[in-house]
Amino acid sequence: MAEYFSPGVYVEEYDNAPRSVEGVGTSTGGFVGLAEKGPTKGAPLLCSSFKDFRKQFGGFLSEYTHGEYRFLANSVEQFFINGGVRCYVSRVAPQDAVSASKEMGILTVTAANEGKWGNRIQISLTTMLKKKMQLLEKIDDAVYKAKSIEGFREGDLVEFNGEYNRIQTIYDEQVTFEEEFEDDPVDVEIVPKKVVRLAAFDVQVRYNDEVENYADVTLNSSSPAFIGAKLANSNIVKVEVAPASEDDEIGNPVEQILGEGIINGTFVLEGGFDGTMSKVNAGTFIGIDDGPGRRTGIQSFLENDRVNIMAVPGVAVPEVIAALTAHCE
């Protein structure tokens, strides 16, 4: 830095000797390759340990199923063993890889991403009738005055004495149902014997030792408890619910999914496929730049400037090496 000795006069000293070669930090790595599971589009995911990698991308791949493309997990493990602090991983997959899925009644459940790992996903549904509403007075046909409407919303399915109904409107404590109840639901006792219950259900999503539990889920699309909203942040599955029609019968929501007379049950996803290894080529690893959030392969690292060193483990295809070198430069 320049030193000022008097107005208009200063002296700056600098080293004229050749600079020595400086090492490049390798604490943060970037990896591209095939994995058991994990997203194949979007920004690479951060892994702060090999355990973290296994949770997001699965374990080691078999030589029998993945051949020369099986080395991603091995390389990430060695990276951490040899002092790596963190890495970012972008999973790639053959174009014909398929996500496991299952359509059950009005519900379609799909694994979060491609691969036969999804064939081990179990979905369990359990009918729950916990929340209660006491009706104090009948005002009109299918219109009642409730003691409290807390926990109930317009569009919710309800149950009374084995009969199912749907709340059409709620105004103050006045509740209008879509249909009239066959039995009288009014009860003015302090401790009521007759109550209307919210028809909800619990959902458990299981993949190996990873379990996600969602309590008091409903099929009411306008409710925060809607199954689509509740499972929106699931790391294991994505769900879609068929839109309701006027011809649909009102009934137990679990029966609408699993079938008539089934109020509790479990099903397994199927059809997941890792893809054909013979269809893996240079383009699989180089990837496609479809814009933010949709990039694949090496191109996905355009959304990441934190890595110090990059690798495509086990791949020595000249086009891939050239693309990787160009990206690093």
Predicted regions and their residues:
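Surface-exposed assembly/interface segments
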Residues: M1-E329
